[in-house]
């Protein structure tokens, strides 16, 4: 699988199916597309593959994937990426698809916020609950510091080596990053509005052990203001039950979780009800022929929000998409057990 986080080109990538979303359903769709003879390109707004599984609960167990009694969300994503390898679908991360237009020849042209263009015969939207954006710190003095001293993600631990850090949040991401940062930062303080957490028990236990060992601090309270004379963060004001305190820090990492937003999808002319794209359950096609939806973003009566359901939806959608990519060609069904070409691809991808 080829990956790119930043591409801008005047020549559009050409493919049979554009898959919007690199969560479990989007990744499986790329594999299934290859199995039935379709090329695909995957685009996702987030900087890493995995969708909600990786962004919200990477280390929580999943029990309802056929033939896998138990695995973490991270393990599932890793296995799906491995499954895709025989077809090497281009994977463009950190790209939000902003516009989708139908060309005179019936094909689709999609453009991302970073200048990537993809032309395809069909589009499969597997974007979960839409684009994920971080919940920002709701303080007027935070915005000018974002990207320099106030952060909503970590790209490289080394960027914070020797720095004083405050990490805000109570979920897995906040605790895990606080624990990771303590290995490189001069000092780390985790702050959360209460003494209870939404993180896994193991993450909470690891954090409390680190605090007891003096490897990091934990404080209960809410961030009231930022002290940044000359535009450089020096401390935060933490409001607590007994009053306010100043915590010295060089950087503030805010991990309040992610919020879902359909964003530009609402402007693509597909019927949307209750935040879901309405689909025909015979083929999971939207109200615009050639645009399909699978996974949590697909809406229909008795919808079950399961990864398993998304796999089924994507499989049927791609079979209809085949007719747009190859209208004059009859698709011949071959069971994977008897597909010699598939066997060769799988073998080659592991050499």
Swiss-Prot record:
Look up keyword Transferase and say if it applies: no
Q: Which UniProt keywords apply?
A: FAD, Flavoprotein, NADP, Oxidoreductase
An example of a GO molecular function for this protein is: ferredoxin-NADP+ reductase activity
Q: Which cofactor does it need?
A: FAD
The enzyme's first-digit EC class, named in words, is: oxidoreductase
Q: Does the keyword Oxidoreductase apply?
A: yes
Reaction(s) catalysed by this chain's protein = 2 reduced [2Fe-2S]-[ferredoxin] + NADP(+) + H(+) = 2 oxidized [2Fe-2S]-[ferredoxin] + NADPH
At the top level, the lineage of the source is Bacteria
Q: Which residues does the record give as FAD binding sites?
A: 44, 52, 57, 97, 132, 296, 337
As for family, the record states: Belongs to the ferredoxin--NADP reductase type 2 family.
Which PANTHER family does this entry report, sorted A to Z?
THIOREDOXIN REDUCTASE 1-RELATED-RELATED
How does the annotation summarize its subunit structure? Homodimer.
| Protein name from the UniProt record | Ferredoxin--NADP reductase
Q: Which organism is it from?
A: Paraburkholderia phymatum (strain DSM 17167 / CIP 108236 / LMG 21445 / STM815) (Burkholderia phymatum)
